[in-house]
Amino acid sequence: MRDIAIVSFAQAPSEQPPGQTETLMLLPTITEALAAVGLTRRDVGFTCSGSADYLTGGTFTFVQMLEAAGAWPPIPESHVEMDGAWALHEAWVRLQHGDVDVALVFSSGRASLGTSLRETLTFQLDPYYLAPLGADFVSLAALQADAVMARTGRTERDFAEIVASRTGGDVETLLAEPYLVAPLRAHDVGPPVDGAAAVVLVAGDRAKDLCERPAWIAGIDHRADPHYPGMRDLAVSRSAALAAEKAGVAQGDVEVAELHAVCTPEELVLADALSLSDKVEVNPSGGGLAANPMMVTGLVRIGEAFRQIAAGRGRVVGHASSGPCLQQNLVCVLEGRN
């Protein structure tokens, strides 16, 4: 296996001007990611993107995003109808072939295009039983919260303490807020925003030439649970636990974990699934509870994990999720090597 590292990460601001297209969000973001390590678009040998046509309301809308990649002469390109973290996994696999040394990964999503994210995400559900009921992701997250409380003895106070630890807010004040969908309140759910992000992957010794402290991908894996929520225990995530095992999370001490949790109960489920000790700092960036750019949040978690390595950390976990109630999970272990 080739050693592959993240050498650069860039993210667009969560607040975008009205009418901003995903291509225009991506253009400066990709340029920033490449320029940070002295690369241009001509240096890229493979590119893979992640986005969702359901958010834009059109077919093959990801094709126009390629204008932001600006690959000339043309290079191999791929796309996943998923969060950009899965595009990163595909790029990692592509670099293992050995004929390409530099890969560009990017993703984008706009939550501000009319239809609410709660309505749009019903399309990912079973089309016969759940989707017609309008079982939105917040309502399903509330069911998961109930399952977590029933199984583990945790309470709404535990949810509020997660939020307070990130915002500096008062737990009692948070608990006094009205329910969004009981037992969840508005602060328990990350706000949907527009977003874009880009990551540069480089294989072998070239990564050391481009970056003072590359984040080496020591392990990466993704697994999925049954699609139908009623066929699994929502208080646990077997797919996240298996992905963590295959990625080698337990093979060393983890200093920081960036978890793709857009609802507070998800963070508790993931911390248990990855067997994170109390010494592990979870989501110092704020995580998906601070902002949830759909199709980008998972890639941002890995990007934030890279930033931790760049800042001197030794071993960090980046995590991404997809589907209702943490149905599919990707775990990436990053290491800084002296």
Give the positions of each predicted feature.
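Short catalytic helix/loop segments, enriched in acidic residues and glycine
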Residues: 19-37
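Short acidic capping loops at alpha-helix termini that bridge into adjacent secondary structure
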Residues: 40-46, 157-158, 251-255, 278-279
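Generic N-terminal amphipathic, Lys/Arg-enriched alpha-helix
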Residues: 2-18
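Acidic/polar N-terminal loop/beta-strand segments that form early-domain functional surfaces
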Residues: 9-12, 47-52
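Flexible glycine-/small-residue-enriched beta->alpha junction loops
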Residues: 103-152
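Glycine-rich, mobile lid/loop segments that gate access to catalytic sites or pores
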Residues: 134-184
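ACP-dependent fatty acid/polyketide chain-elongation machinery
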Residues: 37, 152, 208-211
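Claisen-condensing/thiolase-fold acyl-transfer catalytic domains that form or cleave C-C bonds
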Residues: 2, 20, 27-28, 51-104, ...
